[in-house]
């Protein structure tokens, strides 16, 4: 069975992590080739793309401009600053934050481009919600409602 067949099933909600990482040993040209293949697979299968990016923001932006995706692109574990976050949000990227985040980046993504995650860390997701709500100076319930709305891009209910 090929990858396309496997990811087309209802049990798969996204493609990823697709990555561009300047600290990785793989040459960037190869990383971009594989990344673009995964991005195109996400488009073909109508799935969001989960992205791992380390110090390759210009390459990532160039890839997005080349693909012109209709499906959401979500940057996993975003820890950049508010200026970078604002630039990425203006370009239509969603940002997912874990237990370590820059408060100005959170504000740049709030409300519509924000996701939260744990990435199998020792902190519970409830702790992430609590810390992010505090950083945004909003009630935790308001954050929960907005994240649920943002998650609806995955169309998990059909």
Residue ranges and their predicted role:
Residues 112-124:
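Short acidic/histidine-rich active-site segments
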């Amino acid at each position: 069975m090929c990858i396309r067949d496997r990811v087309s099933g209802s049990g798969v909600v996204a493609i990823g992590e697709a990555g561009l990482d300047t600290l990785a040993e793989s040459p960037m040209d190869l990383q971009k080739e594989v990344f673009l293949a995964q991005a195109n697979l996400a488009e073909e299968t109508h799935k969001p793309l989960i992205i791992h990016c380390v110090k390759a923001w210009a390459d990532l932006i160039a890839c997005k401009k080349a693909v012109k995706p209709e499906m959401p692109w979500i940057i996993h574990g975003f820890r950049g600053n508010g200026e970078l976050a604002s630039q990425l949000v203006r370009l239509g990227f969603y940002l997912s934050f874990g237990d370590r985040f820059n408060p100005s980046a959170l504000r740049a993504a709030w409300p519509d481009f924000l996701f939260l995650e744990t990435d199998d860390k020792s902190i519970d997701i409830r702790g992430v919600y609590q810390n992010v709500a505090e950083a945004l100076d909003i009630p935790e319930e308001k954050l929960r409602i907005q994240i649920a709305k943002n998650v609806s891009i995955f169309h998990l209910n059909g």
